[in-house]
Swiss-Prot record:
It holds the Pfam family ATP-synt_ab. The keyword Translocase applies. It catalyses: ATP + H2O + 4 H(+)(in) = ADP + phosphate + 5 H(+)(out). Its EC number is 7.1.2.2. The gene is atpA. NCBIfam families: PRK04192.1. It comes from Streptococcus gordonii (strain Challis / ATCC 35105 / BCRC 15272 / CH1 / DL1 / V288). GO terms for biological process: proton motive force-driven plasma membrane ATP synthesis. This is V-type ATP synthase alpha chain. Produces ATP from ADP in the presence of a proton gradient across the membrane. The V-type alpha chain is a catalytic subunit.
Amino acid sequence: MSQGKIIKVSGPLVLASGMQEANIQDICRVGDLGLIGEIIEMRRDQASIQVYEETSGLGPGEPVITTGSPLSVELGPGLISQMFDGIQRPLERFQTITESDFLVRGVQLPNLDRETKWNFVPSLSVGDAVEAGDILGTVQETNLVEHRIMVPVGVSGRLANISAGSFTVEETVYEIEQAEGSIFKGTLMQKWPVRRGRPFAQKLIPVEPLVTGQRVIDTFFPVTKGGAAAVPGPFGAGKTVVQHQVAKFANVDIVIYVGCGERGNEMTDVLNEFPELIDPSTGQSIMQRTVLIANTSNMPVAAREASIYTGITIAEYFRDMGYSVAIMADSTSRWAEALREMSGRLEEMPGDEGYPAYLGSRIAEYYERAGRVKTLGSTAREGSITAIGAVSPPGGDISEPVTQNTLRIVKVFWGLDAQLAQRRHFPAINWLSSYSLYLDEVGAYIDQHEKIAWAEKVTKAMNILQKESELQEIVRLVGLDSLSEKDRLTMNAAKMIREDYLQQNAFDDVDTYTSFKKQVALLSNILTFDAEANRALELGAYFREIMEGTVELRDRIARSKFVHEDQLEKIQALSQTIEETLHQILAQGGLDNERH
């Protein structure tokens, strides 16, 4: 520990002298209040410190004390269903201790609760050989999450002692005799610096789809477990609702939700809604698998920059246990703005639109910590982190630096469209401008495991939507009646896909989530209708006759998405009805043809 003194305060940036013994990335206690700060630049004995708390009232001459350790998070039981700020301070306990609705400055409290006792059940015995990543035992943290206690990175040897029972996160639970003869005493908790990725044995290719229950995502633009996706869109297009929907219904074990620089009301919505929502696969409250990190727009700017790293480090910890994790960052644009602010205060050379020249590498560092991996440890385990980042480009202009740097790295682009949002089409993901580079892997995985030609159905549906886009140019110029009968059927099929399949009501109890089997049934019915209608047209029926004869049938297809998951046979039975109805129209059309 070394002590310097403040010589300059510039917003969240503090310049201190007499810091020759300090290192870059060291955590400091700044001023008489002891505010938390991190050294981000060293020049001789002067340190530039970004302070994670409000700096008003700080002045030259006040002390700066370094702790000698980097910004780290505490990893152990007590993370799940908790809400932390950007540097992992527990907000609920913070409020209880300070008796204030605001972040009181200079308060020091442990990140994980030191008083709660957790019931530890060992899975190894004394004398067993262990290495980094091995699971020593488990703690049932919530009904959904079994917290696996692992040997910390850099520790290996023989298990000299291990105890069962109830312990706090600070009490010694096991002892490992290392090769050099020293004894490592381990607790339920370990610390890890947030800016350093946790190690793993091997990176694997992600192939299994992340099922979100959102039809436009799962069908056309899927993301894999271990993939990375970006959700750019203008104000009011529905970025936060898309993130919330994925957080609620994704088929993952753990969800980390980082509210980074967005409005406080959005985190309030999460706190109000998540405890009441039931996970479709387990029947438990989804809050029992969720960690919330809140760094809203009225909190200090510098802590935004740390919040993303705090979230991804917690995600890596659960990944190492063998869990699939999804991390939502809402929004990475606000995080980039925090980088821009600090870069400006440091008087660095600006890049595009004032962002620092290293913006691209910082964004890449974050997304590259996602992925599917084979974890450390003597027993083979797989874990994954799926990173989904919202981007808020000013005015919806996706040519700005944050969006462009993000799109260079991620493989899925869910482009939100203001025009679709204005037409009340939600999720407002534009099916013509969005893309997923995981389509082939996901298609092959589904074809193999579900034994259905899913990739073929998706291609047919997308071709119909693309054909509609081409025909709309003609319709705008000369009207719908000028189209051929076949093209008018294509326009009708595209309308059915858009309104009866892609459009989804997040506030309807049934329509908010669609299982994969239901998605297959819904899309199959629309494609069957289009195929049978085209066949009837080729065999002599007229477009008008097909439309007039299928009013009730099309209404039933449209209402199918509101059928409960446990009544799927009703949707599947519609396929037979579609064929019968169009055969009847064809039979009548044959008679009509003689009259025409």
